[in-house]
Amino acid sequence: MKTRFRKYSKILFGVIMMLYFVAVSHNVYADDVQFTQKTYKILFVGNSHTYYNDMPKMFKGLCDADKINCEVTSITSPGYKLSQFADKTNMYGSQVYQALTNNTWDYVVLQENRAVLVEKEEEAEAAVNTLYTLIHNAGAKMVIYATQPNNIGSTFKVDSLSLFLSDFQIEQILTRNNFKIADEYDGLVAASGTNFMRVMQDYPKITMYKTDNLHPSVTGSYLAACTIYNTIFDRSPYGNKYLPNSEYDKDNLISKVSMKNALIMQKIADSRLKVDSYYTTVSKGQNSKLTATFTSTQTDESETTEDTTKKTKDETKTSDEKETTVTDNKDTISTYTNKIMWDAVDANSISINRITGEFTALKAGKYQVMSTTDSGLICYSTIDVKQPSTAFNINE
């Protein structure tokens, strides 16, 4: 009797395990089908911060390594502003206009000139307003590529005053205004600049800039590509096989990046901070709540990182791209609590609970609130506060 029971128990256990693996396989397959059965058409529009180091091709490499079919097109010109790309009488603006009116797209990645975002944010908004109509009609989702600040700060003309802003101050303005514009048009923000600052904070020995202290190094462009990849597909780049000297690095675009540093860039771009609503409309005096979520696929991968690094050969680097390979195993996720905190840009207009995200709209107008983590992630949401209508009773 016991022998028969054991026999049936083994059969039942085998059936259960078989069903489990079938279910897991089905879920993985269903997730992959979402990407493998479609070819995504993606257009990049920007200046040198987009085309330096062939960053859009790096993005394509990440897609290829993850078996995501995509066609990537770029329209770029050095120093250009979105207002020029939005002008169809401009040489490159005409190319953008033709690309958006004669084709359908899945995503259009826009990158604004940093000086415009700091000095003339309304000009950037007007340009995006023009481009958004074309993007929407082309069936695409708009993505704002938020770039890094100057490494050593810079002087800007703000409200007729010449002000020197540090890299941190520039990054704050760039991030806030990029989110402000994206929120207005239901766009996504690829916060590469935020991730740059996180690398500079936690891995100061990694070379993230060219010698001009403005444009990204190859490592910096790889971080940007990883950030945009995660933003568009909501798919972590952590563990992606598009790595230096891999079969997917066909053009040797990232051969100058050490394996260790490439994995760090993937790790930094892996974690994201998301808000349940990036644009909320409420009435003055109304109470409401926003919820932010921190996401990361990371676990302690120090052993895997070390094993992979040992397999890496030393690469020859030009003097402009020579970087320091980080030798520590600091995990930027595990060393932070990543507790989410809230704050209002204008506390006199929006009163928000720093812990819960519950807020009260105090004044009519559009205002931003931000959620942050101690690991340096930041996300802005726009609250559109309407003046309540007043009802009048007329007695005859």
Give the ranges of each region predicted by the language model.
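Sec-dependent signal peptide cleavage junction
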Residues: V22-Q34
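Bacterial N-terminal signal peptides
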Residues: L12-A23
